[in-house]
Amino acid sequence: MSDVELAYAVGQTVEVTAVDVAQGGWCVARPEGLPVLFVRHALPGERVLARVTEVTSRFARADAIEVRDASPDRVEPPCPNAHPGGCGGCDWQHASLPAQRALKASVIAQQLRRVAGLELDAEITVEALPGDEPAEPGPTTETTESTETGQPGLGWRTRVQFAVRPDGLAGLRGHRSHEVIDIGDCPIAHPAIRDLGLLDYSWEGAGTVEAAVGSPEPADPGHQDSVVILTKAGRAPRGRRAPGSVPGNAAAHDERGRVARDRSEDRAVEFFPQEAVDSVEAESVLIRSAHRLTPLRGRQFLTQFAAGRHWQVNAGGFWQVHPAAADTLSEAVVAALEPKPGDTALDLYAGAGLFAGVLAPLVGADGAVTVIESDAAAVRDARANLGEYPWVAVHRNDVSLAVKDAGLPQARLVVADPPRAGLAREVVDYLTGGSQAERFAYVSCDPATLARDLGLLIAGGWRVDGLRAFDAFPMTHHVECVVTLTR
């Protein structure tokens, strides 16, 4: 057995002092004579009683079940489910918003220093998004009212996926757990999602029920797209399948009231409660199966408004979940790339084409923008969103393959917004090898993979000219960064 396994056992309690913050919403404790312990629900500087929840050969995890010496940054969580054994969706509800941002800034700096060997000249600060700005400068200043809820840091999440228990109750899972918690409400969910009342229905037969809302145009704030997406549970409830296929937007139901899809059309039978599907006041209700969305009613996309225009986004596709994030990140990318008329640009992991759509009018008809995206639905959206710009070419391809294609046009400017796993190694090799790019805007939602990639890019001749961090996910440990690299 390892030293950690000899020192700790699940359920054991130990009094510790949290001395630092770690990636993932944890605090670090170093009890005298014992291995390092990663503790949730604590804050740096606090002395807490921690209960061990997990032991591995390399480390142990614990929950702070009693605070014996509280930090001045500690606040009462706005959600009653934000406690040990409760919902696992949020990490920092027990910290003030300015303290949350300071913790995230510390994690970014740690990762850059430890992984990339990078110390930035300027101190890293995590910026509040519009609606959550501090009223005055300072690390512990209270924030102004949120544009969505009147409460800072709440009501921002425009997409939420709830898990469904076998009895049909929808909720959220506990931290690192398969248990579905009966939460009753989710304060970080957008008001338009909360108004759907998904937690009031029985979703027996579903594995998940997901809700997403579009962002309305400021001139017409009363209209907001909404969609509910259902997936089947691992094993459907018993019930006779309704005969025949389900054409168009109509829904067929079996004799027990569950929505059914014909196997010949969907390759699977989907059963969902008729009352919930018929009653929920979403504009669109869809079933997700085999990477496909099938409408029971409504349409398969949401309309988002950002950068002064509308965007078509597949109902199950990627879009920033904070209402102010798309605008904020677009502005940051433009500032990082400094596009000029006639420039050439490459948008990697482009999604629905947000950054390409912002760059296209700036480089103009004498320039060119190449878009690479692997997801078929996102490519359809990007082509619809960018069709007004003949100088934009949208390609469906795996980014790691596209950058090895000798026919890929050279570009002076590159922007990449990869998933949490970061840049594919082929992309790093391209940027440090065959690419002739002079400026690179790296949009990242994970400080650890960002630091890994920056270390490789710096070794390959790039230099970091600036980093901006944004609190696009209040109450959680997640943070969005835009890094400017030049060479």
Predicted regions and their residues:
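S-adenosylmethionine
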Residues: 395-481
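Accessory RNA-recognition modules of RNA-modification enzymes
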Residues: 1-416, 421-427, 436
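Conserved beta strand-loop-helix elements of the APE1-like EEP
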Residues: 482-487
